[in-house]
Structures are given as C-alpha cells and as structure tokens.
Amino acid sequence: MVYSVGLTGNIASGKSTVAEFFSELGINVIYADKIAKELTSKNTPCYQDIISHFGSSVVLNNGELDRKRIRDIIFSNSNERLWLESLLHPVIRKKIEEQLIVCTSPYCLIEIPLLFNKHHYPYLQKVLLVIAPLESQLDRIVKRDHCTKKQALAILATQPNLEQRLEAADDVLINESGLSELKAKVNKLHQKYLREAKIKQ
C-alpha cells in the first residue's frame, strides 16, 4: 500500500490550509470528515443508527441530519461523543483504506481531525500534527461558526489535549506566521515524505 501520512490538529489549527498546500504539490488528499458526511447522508445505515440513538430531534425538515444539533450534543456529553465515534470510526477507517488502494501520488495525505491514536489506523507511516496559538484558533472558530468566544472555548475544551496529540505525532508543524511561511514548511515536509516514500518502495 502507498506510503501514507495522517494529518491532524485541533479545530481551527490550519489543517485544511496545510492539506490544500500538499494537494497543490500533486499529493492525493483523503478527508475523513468528508467520508463521515457521506456515510451519514440521508438513508444510509449510519444515518438510521444515529436517528435511532438520538431521536427525531436531530433530523431537519428536509430529512437530512441536523449536524449542528448533533455537534452541540456531543460537545456537551462525552458519552454521546464516544458512542458516535464508535459507530463512525470503523467504517471511516475502512473507506480510507479503500481510497488508499487507488492513490496515484508518491505518498498520500489523510486528514483525520481526531487522530491521537495511531494504532487505530495501522496503514499510517507518519502522523503530522498542526499546532496554532490559542488566540488564532479562537478567532478562526468565532469567524467560521459565528459563535461567541465562550462557545469557541467550549469547542476547544472537547478536543484531545496537546500532550495526547504530541504523543501520537512524528512531525509537528507550527502555524504561527503567515501563509508564505506555512507553505515553505509544507514544501520542506513534502521533500522529506517523498524521500521516505521512495525508501519504503
């Protein structure tokens, strides 16, 4: 199977921008969140399981899942979050594996927001962690989700702590300056992963 790098980091750390930069360099990127959205779209098995568990209050008028409502539930109740993760993670892992088989770039990048245990993804050779200063994260969450700073802090509080993240990480990318510096760091890592992928072959 192709050499693969797991890209992770807390919410609003700049993961998506980093993934875009790798994509511009010709690297295939797999998005776990996108897979999760497809797996929970209307009338899928996971969709039915979620409604059976949470009830009709998580369904919008058009029949789609009310993702904001579900997010509010799991951010305020760790047991509900664990239930949802146990439902989705095994099927997400399987879908990622299927996409890795058809990867055409020298290595593949997999964006997995909640990756803090590499053993759950045995096909990963490396884990790249993106870190951003707390204030930057808060600003991004407030702007993106149109929420208060207090709500943004509550969202961040549900994320794995930095120690857990660092324990799983092989490489750490600190996103604290402008885009040009971030791009330069990505280019450097790209060269490193190209070399490592070549050795693996």
Curated annotation (Swiss-Prot):
According to its UniProt record, this protein's enzyme class is transferase
Annotated protein name in UniProt: Dephospho-CoA kinase
Q: Where in the cell is it found?
A: Cytoplasm
- DPCK domain: residues covered: 4-201
- GO terms classed as biological process: coenzyme A biosynthetic process
Q: Which GO terms describe its molecular function?
A: ATP binding; dephospho-CoA kinase activity
Provide the catalytic activity annotation: 3'-dephospho-CoA + ATP = ADP + CoA + H(+)
Q: Fetch the InterPro entries from UniProt.
A: Depp_CoAkinase, P-loop_NTPase
- PROSITE patterns (UniProt xref): DPCK
What gene name does this entry carry?
Answer: coaE
Q: What is its main location?
A: cytoplasm
Q: Which residues bind ATP?
A: 12-17
| Keywords assigned by UniProt, alphabetized | ATP-binding, Coenzyme A biosynthesis, Cytoplasm, Kinase, Nucleotide-binding, Transferase
